[in-house]
Protein backbone atom coordinates (compact mmCIF):
# COMPACT_ATOMS: atom_id res chain seq x y z
CA UNK A 1 0.00 0.00 0.00
CA UNK A 2 1.32 3.45 -0.88
CA UNK A 3 2.51 5.64 1.97
CA UNK A 4 0.66 8.55 0.37
CA UNK A 5 0.55 11.63 2.57
CA UNK A 6 -0.71 15.13 1.97
CA UNK A 7 1.40 18.12 2.95
CA UNK A 8 -0.55 18.58 6.17
CA UNK A 9 -0.20 14.92 7.10
CA UNK A 10 3.50 15.05 6.32
CA UNK A 11 3.96 18.02 8.61
CA UNK A 12 2.24 16.13 11.43
CA UNK A 13 4.44 13.13 10.79
CA UNK A 14 7.65 15.16 10.75
CA UNK A 15 6.81 16.69 14.10
CA UNK A 16 7.13 13.27 15.71
CA UNK A 17 9.64 11.49 13.47
CA UNK A 18 12.95 12.47 11.89
CA UNK A 19 13.38 9.22 9.96
CA UNK A 20 11.13 6.79 8.15
CA UNK A 21 12.02 3.15 7.58
CA UNK A 22 11.55 1.96 3.99
CA UNK A 23 13.13 -0.72 1.81
CA UNK A 24 16.76 -0.40 0.79
CA UNK A 25 17.40 -0.31 -2.97
CA UNK A 26 20.41 -0.98 -5.15
CA UNK A 27 21.22 -0.84 -8.85
CA UNK A 28 23.30 -2.94 -11.22
CA UNK A 29 26.52 -1.57 -12.74
CA UNK A 30 26.78 -4.40 -15.27
CA UNK A 31 24.79 -3.71 -18.41
CA UNK A 32 24.69 0.00 -19.15
CA UNK A 33 27.49 2.49 -19.69
CA UNK A 34 25.56 5.09 -17.71
CA UNK A 35 25.68 2.80 -14.67
CA UNK A 36 29.35 1.80 -14.88
CA UNK A 37 31.57 3.97 -12.64
CA UNK A 38 34.61 2.84 -14.63
CA UNK A 39 33.33 4.65 -17.73
CA UNK A 40 33.62 8.45 -17.46
CA UNK A 41 30.27 10.16 -17.89
CA UNK A 42 31.76 12.24 -20.71
CA UNK A 43 32.49 9.05 -22.67
CA UNK A 44 29.02 7.52 -22.38
CA UNK A 45 27.15 7.33 -25.69
CA UNK A 46 23.59 6.78 -24.57
CA UNK A 47 22.27 7.51 -28.07
CA UNK A 48 23.56 4.08 -29.12
CA UNK A 49 21.09 1.43 -27.93
CA UNK A 50 20.32 3.56 -24.86
CA UNK A 51 23.78 2.87 -23.44
CA UNK A 52 23.55 -0.94 -23.48
CA UNK A 53 27.09 -2.33 -23.59
CA UNK A 54 27.96 -4.08 -26.84
CA UNK A 55 28.69 -7.43 -25.17
CA UNK A 56 25.10 -7.68 -23.92
CA UNK A 57 21.70 -7.97 -25.58
CA UNK A 58 18.40 -6.71 -24.21
CA UNK A 59 17.42 -10.33 -23.70
CA UNK A 60 20.54 -10.79 -21.55
CA UNK A 61 19.35 -7.98 -19.31
CA UNK A 62 15.75 -9.12 -18.90
CA UNK A 63 16.38 -12.87 -18.72
CA UNK A 64 19.00 -12.45 -16.00
CA UNK A 65 16.96 -10.24 -13.71
CA UNK A 66 16.76 -11.65 -10.20
CA UNK A 67 13.38 -12.07 -8.54
CA UNK A 68 13.85 -8.78 -6.67
CA UNK A 69 15.03 -6.81 -9.74
CA UNK A 70 13.28 -4.87 -12.49
CA UNK A 71 14.48 -3.00 -15.55
CA UNK A 72 13.28 0.59 -15.24
CA UNK A 73 13.09 2.89 -18.25
CA UNK A 74 13.22 6.32 -16.61
CA UNK A 75 12.19 9.00 -19.06
CA UNK A 76 12.42 12.77 -18.65
CA UNK A 77 9.78 14.94 -20.29
CA UNK A 78 10.63 17.03 -23.33
CA UNK A 79 11.51 20.69 -23.06
CA UNK A 80 8.73 22.65 -21.37
CA UNK A 81 8.05 26.36 -21.23
CA UNK A 82 9.39 26.44 -17.67
CA UNK A 83 12.75 25.26 -19.04
CA UNK A 84 13.13 28.23 -21.39
CA UNK A 85 11.41 31.01 -19.43
CA UNK A 86 14.23 31.60 -16.87
CA UNK A 87 16.60 32.67 -19.66
CA UNK A 88 14.52 35.84 -20.03
CA UNK A 89 15.25 37.00 -16.49
CA UNK A 90 18.14 37.39 -14.10
CA UNK A 91 18.54 34.50 -11.70
CA UNK A 92 17.53 36.59 -8.71
CA UNK A 93 14.47 38.02 -10.47
CA UNK A 94 13.41 34.53 -11.49
CA UNK A 95 13.86 32.96 -8.07
CA UNK A 96 12.44 35.88 -6.12
CA UNK A 97 9.42 36.66 -8.27
CA UNK A 98 8.89 35.22 -11.73
CA UNK A 99 9.14 31.52 -10.83
CA UNK A 100 6.16 32.02 -8.54
CA UNK A 101 4.03 33.59 -11.28
CA UNK A 102 1.94 31.59 -13.75
CA UNK A 103 3.57 33.09 -16.83
CA UNK A 104 4.16 36.24 -18.86
CA UNK A 105 3.31 37.63 -22.30
CA UNK A 106 1.23 34.60 -23.25
CA UNK A 107 3.85 32.06 -22.15
CA UNK A 108 2.51 29.86 -19.33
CA UNK A 109 4.99 27.98 -17.19
CA UNK A 110 2.62 27.03 -14.37
CA UNK A 111 2.27 23.26 -14.78
CA UNK A 112 4.03 23.89 -18.08
CA UNK A 113 3.29 22.16 -21.35
CA UNK A 114 5.89 21.16 -23.94
CA UNK A 115 7.46 23.68 -26.29
CA UNK A 116 7.59 22.82 -30.02
CA UNK A 117 11.20 21.77 -29.43
CA UNK A 118 10.04 19.55 -26.57
CA UNK A 119 7.48 17.88 -28.81
CA UNK A 120 10.20 17.22 -31.39
CA UNK A 121 12.51 15.78 -28.74
CA UNK A 122 9.90 13.22 -27.75
CA UNK A 123 9.03 12.41 -31.35
CA UNK A 124 12.73 11.65 -31.81
CA UNK A 125 12.72 9.43 -28.72
CA UNK A 126 9.64 7.61 -30.01
CA UNK A 127 11.53 6.88 -33.22
CA UNK A 128 14.63 5.72 -31.33
CA UNK A 129 12.56 3.21 -29.37
CA UNK A 130 10.85 2.06 -32.56
CA UNK A 131 14.20 1.62 -34.33
CA UNK A 132 15.96 -0.19 -31.46
CA UNK A 133 16.19 -3.92 -32.27
CA UNK A 134 14.64 -6.12 -29.58
CA UNK A 135 13.79 -3.16 -27.36
CA UNK A 136 12.22 -4.65 -24.21
CA UNK A 137 8.62 -3.47 -24.22
CA UNK A 138 7.52 -2.21 -20.80
CA UNK A 139 4.86 -4.26 -19.09
CA UNK A 140 3.66 -1.44 -16.83
CA UNK A 141 3.59 2.31 -17.34
CA UNK A 142 3.62 5.06 -14.73
CA UNK A 143 3.55 8.81 -15.26
CA UNK A 144 3.71 12.07 -13.31
CA UNK A 145 0.48 14.11 -13.13
CA UNK A 146 2.04 17.27 -14.60
CA UNK A 147 1.01 18.28 -18.11
CA UNK A 148 4.45 18.05 -19.71
CA UNK A 149 4.85 14.44 -18.61
CA UNK A 150 1.34 13.50 -19.72
CA UNK A 151 2.09 14.97 -23.14
CA UNK A 152 5.44 13.20 -23.20
CA UNK A 153 3.85 9.84 -22.45
CA UNK A 154 1.33 10.25 -25.25
CA UNK A 155 3.91 11.24 -27.85
CA UNK A 156 6.35 8.52 -26.78
CA UNK A 157 4.09 5.50 -26.54
CA UNK A 158 1.15 6.07 -28.86
CA UNK A 159 1.87 3.94 -31.91
CA UNK A 160 4.06 1.58 -29.89
CA UNK A 161 2.99 -1.43 -27.80
CA UNK A 162 1.74 -0.13 -24.47
CA UNK A 163 -0.76 -0.50 -21.68
CA UNK A 164 -2.80 2.19 -19.95
CA UNK A 165 -0.49 4.36 -17.83
CA UNK A 166 -1.14 4.93 -14.13
CA UNK A 167 -0.79 8.51 -12.89
CA UNK A 168 1.36 8.55 -9.73
CA UNK A 169 1.41 11.60 -7.45
CA UNK A 170 4.90 10.83 -6.17
CA UNK A 171 6.34 10.69 -9.71
CA UNK A 172 6.00 14.49 -9.92
CA UNK A 173 8.80 17.03 -9.88
CA UNK A 174 10.25 18.50 -6.68
CA UNK A 175 7.33 20.61 -5.56
CA UNK A 176 6.54 23.84 -3.79
CA UNK A 177 6.98 27.62 -4.22
CA UNK A 178 7.50 27.68 -8.00
CA UNK A 179 4.39 27.43 -10.15
CA UNK A 180 5.83 24.90 -12.60
CA UNK A 181 5.67 22.24 -9.88
CA UNK A 182 1.98 22.80 -9.08
CA UNK A 183 -0.39 20.34 -10.73
CA UNK A 184 -3.91 20.91 -11.99
CA UNK A 185 -6.84 19.32 -10.21
CA UNK A 186 -7.87 15.74 -10.87
CA UNK A 187 -10.90 16.71 -12.98
CA UNK A 188 -8.74 18.82 -15.28
CA UNK A 189 -6.19 16.02 -15.63
CA UNK A 190 -8.92 13.49 -16.43
CA UNK A 191 -10.26 15.74 -19.17
CA UNK A 192 -6.71 16.34 -20.42
CA UNK A 193 -5.88 12.62 -20.69
CA UNK A 194 -9.22 10.77 -20.36
CA UNK A 195 -7.77 7.34 -21.12
CA UNK A 196 -5.21 7.47 -18.30
CA UNK A 197 -5.89 5.90 -14.90
CA UNK A 198 -5.30 7.42 -11.47
CA UNK A 199 -3.74 5.61 -8.55
CA UNK A 200 -5.93 5.00 -5.54
CA UNK A 201 -6.00 8.00 -3.22
CA UNK A 202 -5.21 10.61 -5.87
CA UNK A 203 -6.82 13.79 -4.53
CA UNK A 204 -8.96 16.27 -6.46
CA UNK A 205 -6.86 19.25 -5.40
CA UNK A 206 -3.08 19.44 -5.20
CA UNK A 207 -2.65 18.97 -1.45
CA UNK A 208 1.13 18.61 -1.57
CA UNK A 209 2.17 21.86 -3.24
CA UNK A 210 2.65 24.95 -1.06
CA UNK A 211 3.48 28.54 -2.08
CA UNK A 212 5.62 28.91 1.04
CA UNK A 213 7.73 25.77 1.18
CA UNK A 214 9.51 23.48 -1.27
CA UNK A 215 10.57 19.93 -0.58
CA UNK A 216 14.28 19.46 0.01
CA UNK A 217 16.52 16.87 -1.63
CA UNK A 218 16.14 14.86 1.56
CA UNK A 219 12.38 14.71 1.23
CA UNK A 220 12.68 13.98 -2.49
CA UNK A 221 14.82 10.93 -1.68
CA UNK A 222 12.17 9.74 0.76
CA UNK A 223 9.49 10.23 -1.90
CA UNK A 224 11.58 8.35 -4.47
CA UNK A 225 11.86 5.42 -2.05
CA UNK A 226 8.07 5.41 -1.55
CA UNK A 227 7.52 5.57 -5.31
CA UNK A 228 9.78 2.57 -5.87
CA UNK A 229 8.08 0.62 -3.10
CA UNK A 230 4.72 1.32 -4.71
CA UNK A 231 5.90 0.21 -8.13
CA UNK A 232 7.45 -3.00 -6.84
CA UNK A 233 4.29 -3.77 -4.86
CA UNK A 234 2.01 -2.98 -7.81
CA UNK A 235 4.10 -4.99 -10.29
CA UNK A 236 4.96 -8.31 -8.66
CA UNK A 237 5.30 -10.23 -11.93
CA UNK A 238 6.31 -7.50 -14.38
CA UNK A 239 10.00 -7.14 -15.15
CA UNK A 240 10.15 -4.06 -17.40
CA UNK A 241 8.76 -0.78 -16.10
CA UNK A 242 8.34 2.60 -17.79
CA UNK A 243 8.15 5.80 -15.74
CA UNK A 244 7.79 9.25 -17.32
CA UNK A 245 8.84 11.92 -14.87
CA UNK A 246 11.22 14.86 -14.23
CA UNK A 247 14.91 15.57 -13.75
CA UNK A 248 14.67 16.31 -10.02
CA UNK A 249 12.85 13.12 -9.06
CA UNK A 250 15.01 11.12 -11.48
CA UNK A 251 18.14 12.31 -9.66
CA UNK A 252 16.53 11.35 -6.35
CA UNK A 253 15.68 7.90 -7.68
CA UNK A 254 19.25 7.40 -8.87
CA UNK A 255 20.55 8.56 -5.49
CA UNK A 256 18.27 6.20 -3.56
CA UNK A 257 19.35 3.16 -5.61
CA UNK A 258 23.07 3.99 -5.33
CA UNK A 259 23.45 4.91 -8.99
CA UNK A 260 26.02 7.51 -9.90
CA UNK A 261 24.91 10.97 -10.99
CA UNK A 262 24.12 11.03 -14.69
CA UNK A 263 22.94 14.22 -16.43
CA UNK A 264 19.55 14.00 -18.11
CA UNK A 265 18.65 16.42 -20.89
CA UNK A 266 15.00 17.14 -21.65
CA UNK A 267 13.62 14.34 -23.78
CA UNK A 268 16.21 11.91 -22.45
CA UNK A 269 15.84 8.42 -21.00
CA UNK A 270 17.97 6.10 -18.91
CA UNK A 271 17.56 2.33 -18.38
CA UNK A 272 18.43 1.18 -14.85
CA UNK A 273 18.28 -2.27 -13.27
CA UNK A 274 16.94 -1.69 -9.77
CA UNK A 275 16.70 -4.20 -6.93
CA UNK A 276 14.55 -3.96 -3.83
CA UNK A 277 16.34 -5.53 -0.88
CA UNK A 278 14.71 -7.67 1.81
CA UNK A 279 15.62 -5.24 4.57
CA UNK A 280 14.84 -1.62 5.39
CA UNK A 281 16.94 1.46 5.89
CA UNK A 282 16.16 4.79 7.52
CA UNK A 283 15.40 7.79 5.33
CA UNK A 284 16.06 11.00 7.29
CA UNK A 285 13.41 13.72 7.35
CA UNK A 286 14.92 16.21 9.77
CA UNK A 287 15.47 18.74 6.97
CA UNK A 288 12.51 18.04 4.70
CA UNK A 289 11.57 21.52 3.51
CA UNK A 290 13.16 24.64 2.08
CA UNK A 291 11.58 28.05 2.58
CA UNK A 292 11.14 31.03 0.29
CA UNK A 293 14.15 32.59 2.02
CA UNK A 294 16.24 29.66 0.79
CA UNK A 295 15.07 30.46 -2.74
CA UNK A 296 15.49 34.21 -2.39
CA UNK A 297 18.02 34.97 0.37
CA UNK A 298 18.66 38.54 -0.81
CA UNK A 299 15.52 40.03 -2.37
CA UNK A 300 16.26 42.80 -4.85
CA UNK A 301 14.82 46.27 -4.32
CA UNK A 302 12.75 45.85 -7.47
CA UNK A 303 11.95 43.19 -10.06
CA UNK A 304 12.69 43.89 -13.71
CA UNK A 305 9.65 43.92 -15.98
CA UNK A 306 7.23 44.72 -13.15
CA UNK A 307 6.20 47.51 -10.83
CA UNK A 308 6.98 45.19 -7.93
CA UNK A 309 9.05 46.52 -5.06
CA UNK A 310 10.24 43.85 -2.67
CA UNK A 311 11.38 46.56 -0.33
CA UNK A 312 7.81 47.78 0.21
CA UNK A 313 6.26 44.35 -0.10
CA UNK A 314 4.02 45.31 -3.02
CA UNK A 315 3.24 42.73 -5.69
From Swiss-Prot:
<dbReference type="InterPro" id="IPR029033">
    <property type="entry name" value="His_PPase_superfam"/>
</dbReference>
<dbReference type="GO" id="GO:0016853">
    <property type="term" value="F:isomerase activity"/>
</dbReference>
<comment type="similarity">
    <text>Belongs to the phosphoglycerate mutase family.</text>
</comment>
<feature type="glycosylation site" description="N-linked (GlcNAc...) asparagine">
    <location>
        <position position="185"/>
    </location>
</feature>
<dbReference type="GO" id="GO:0005737">
    <property type="term" value="C:cytoplasm"/>
</dbReference>
<feature type="signal peptide">
    <location>
        <begin position="1"/>
        <end position="19"/>
    </location>
</feature>
<keyword id="KW-1003">Cell membrane</keyword>
<keyword id="KW-0325">Glycoprotein</keyword>
<feature type="site" description="Transition state stabilizer">
    <location>
        <position position="246"/>
    </location>
</feature>
<keyword id="KW-0732">Signal</keyword>
<keyword id="KW-0472">Membrane</keyword>
<feature type="lipid moiety-binding region" description="GPI-anchor amidated asparagine">
    <location>
        <position position="286"/>
    </location>
</feature>
<dbReference type="InterPro" id="IPR013078">
    <property type="entry name" value="His_Pase_superF_clade-1"/>
</dbReference>
<dbReference type="GO" id="GO:0005576">
    <property type="term" value="C:extracellular region"/>
</dbReference>
<keyword id="KW-0336">GPI-anchor</keyword>
<keyword id="KW-0449">Lipoprotein</keyword>
<dbReference type="InterPro" id="IPR050275">
    <property type="entry name" value="PGM_Phosphatase"/>
</dbReference>
<feature type="active site" description="Proton donor/acceptor">
    <location>
        <position position="173"/>
    </location>
</feature>
<keyword id="KW-0413">Isomerase</keyword>
<feature type="active site" description="Tele-phosphohistidine intermediate">
    <location>
        <position position="77"/>
    </location>
</feature>
<feature type="glycosylation site" description="N-linked (GlcNAc...) asparagine">
    <location>
        <position position="154"/>
    </location>
</feature>
<dbReference type="GO" id="GO:0098552">
    <property type="term" value="C:side of membrane"/>
</dbReference>
<feature type="propeptide" description="Removed in mature form">
    <location>
        <begin position="287"/>
        <end position="315"/>
    </location>
</feature>
<dbReference type="Pfam" id="PF00300">
    <property type="entry name" value="His_Phos_1"/>
</dbReference>
<dbReference type="GO" id="GO:0005886">
    <property type="term" value="C:plasma membrane"/>
</dbReference>
<protein>
    <recommendedName>
        <fullName>Phosphomutase-like protein 3</fullName>
    </recommendedName>
</protein>
<feature type="glycosylation site" description="N-linked (GlcNAc...) asparagine">
    <location>
        <position position="88"/>
    </location>
</feature>
<dbReference type="GO" id="GO:0016791">
    <property type="term" value="F:phosphatase activity"/>
</dbReference>
Amino acid sequence: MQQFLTLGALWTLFNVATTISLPKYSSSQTYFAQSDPNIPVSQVDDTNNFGLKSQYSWDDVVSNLASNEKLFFLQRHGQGWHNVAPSNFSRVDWNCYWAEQSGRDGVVWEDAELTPKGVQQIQNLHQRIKDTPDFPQPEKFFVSPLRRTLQTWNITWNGLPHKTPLIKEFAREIYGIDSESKRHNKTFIHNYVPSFEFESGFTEQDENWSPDKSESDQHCDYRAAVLLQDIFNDSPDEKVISVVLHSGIIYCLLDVVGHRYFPMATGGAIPVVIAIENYNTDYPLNDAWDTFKDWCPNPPASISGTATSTATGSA
